[in-house]
Amino acid sequence: MDVTQSNATKDDANITVTPWPYTETAAAFIILVVSVIILVSIVGNVLVIVAVLTSRALRAPQNLFLVSLACADILVATLVIPFSLANEIMGYWFFGSTWCAFYLALDVLFCTSSIVHLCAISLDRYWSVTKAVSYNLKRTPKRIKSMIAVVWVISAVISFPPLIMTKHDEKECLINDETWYILSSSLVSFFAPGFIMITVYCKIYRVAKQRSSTVFVAKNGLERQPSQSETCFVRKDKFEKESPSSNSSESNQRQEELDDIDLEESATSDNKPKSSRFSNRRRVDGARCCPQRTCRISWVSSQEQSSKQLAVASKTKVAQMREKRFTFVLTVVMGVFVLCWFPFFFTYSLHAICGDSCEPPEALFKLFFWIGYCNSSVNPIIYTIFNRDFRKAFKKICLLDCAAHLRDSCLGTLGRLNAKCIFECHQKSNQEETAN
């Protein structure tokens, strides 16, 4: 929200514009820094979008929030920051009152949408933690897209007033500076969503802490599960058993003992085996267990069951660890967003309450203003530093682009050099895909 006043003055017939507020060196430095911010914002957030849409590890429905958030940051970098930079360097608004109204509305829209996105993400995480089974079944792409649409509608409603409350002046672009509007817009656009985010993440932390204190440990890592077919206790001397091991010493050791076996019974008139699952084990007689049927008795292989259970447990653990990493990353994103925008909104609101008595220095206020814009370029950096899945996806995207350029250059070579180059390109791409 640009509240920088212009240095333009009007005479009766002519418009006299004061010199630029910065020296050439200072202006060049500011342009360079802001250009880097714009470039990082666009490239980084485009990478985020491509990574979420193409990486298998990032294709969860809830990550669509990150795609929408990245789109908002790209729009800030393309439709807001360049005009703010021009207004800052020249010292007056050059683009007319009509675009000024749209510019201020877009500024409020994208800033508000960013924090409302983070608010929606925090609620999504909270529901996934507190209502894991029921909510995760409802956590479909369609539902997430509906939530994203609501986020943008809320942001659009909040950003509508600047279109009708802008001061119409060809040489300055100022938003409504009335106290009621400053306080209400700051409350709705920042403080209220920020309070909701912080409260929700505190609850998530509390729930996670309670769960981590309750640990269920099964002996040997797994509990014994009943087999899919009927499980009986049968005396060894009444049946001829097929055991994986025909060792005589093992047979002597098991003799006259009641052992847990897997009974697969098939009727002579049926080709398909009939199996039934019993939750309670029963002690039965051999004749009652298989009356006039072809019976095959084999020892239960706990190794096969254990391997299946380990595979399921491993997948569940990987999903839980990925969810924890993402929750941590989003906590960092939320914290950085608050740190970037809090100084601006605090001084903006404080000035509306106290007036000139607590007005911050102009240079400090401008610094807070531009720190808020820097947030658009920070999220991709956070994803890269703190999340391994994003790091792998970014690396894969960059390497694939590099491999594509190498292939293009290979097409210009001849003979064996061409074939060798193409082979190396494919090899690098395949190695990277295998590693991921």
Swiss-Prot record:
Which regions span the lipid bilayer? 28-52, 65-90, 101-123, 145-167, 179-202, 330-353, 367-387
Q: Where is the composition biased (Acidic residues)?
A: 257-267
Which ranges make up the Extracellular topological domains here? 1-27, 91-100, 168-178, 354-366
Query: What InterPro entries does the annotation carry?
Result: ADR_fam, GPCR_Rhodpsn, GPCR_Rhodpsn_7TM
Q: Name one GO biological process term.
A: adenylate cyclase-inhibiting adrenergic receptor signaling pathway
The record ties this protein, via Pfam families, to: 7tm_1 (PF00001)
Record topology, Cytoplasmic segments: 53-64, 124-144, 203-329, 388-436
For this record, the Gene Ontology CC terms, alphabetical, are: plasma membrane
In terms of domain of life, where is this protein from?
Answer: Eukaryota
Keywords on record: Cell membrane, Disulfide bond, G-protein coupled receptor, Glycoprotein, Membrane, Receptor, Transducer, Transmembrane, Transmembrane helix
Disulfide linkage: 100-173
Disordered, as annotated region: 238-280
> Which of this chain's residues carry glycans?
7, 14
Principal localization reads membrane
Location in the cell reads: Cell membrane
Described function: Alpha-2 adrenergic receptors mediate the catecholamine-induced inhibition of adenylate cyclase through the action of G proteins.
Similarity comment: Belongs to the G-protein coupled receptor 1 family.
Q: What is this protein called?
A: Alpha-2 adrenergic receptor
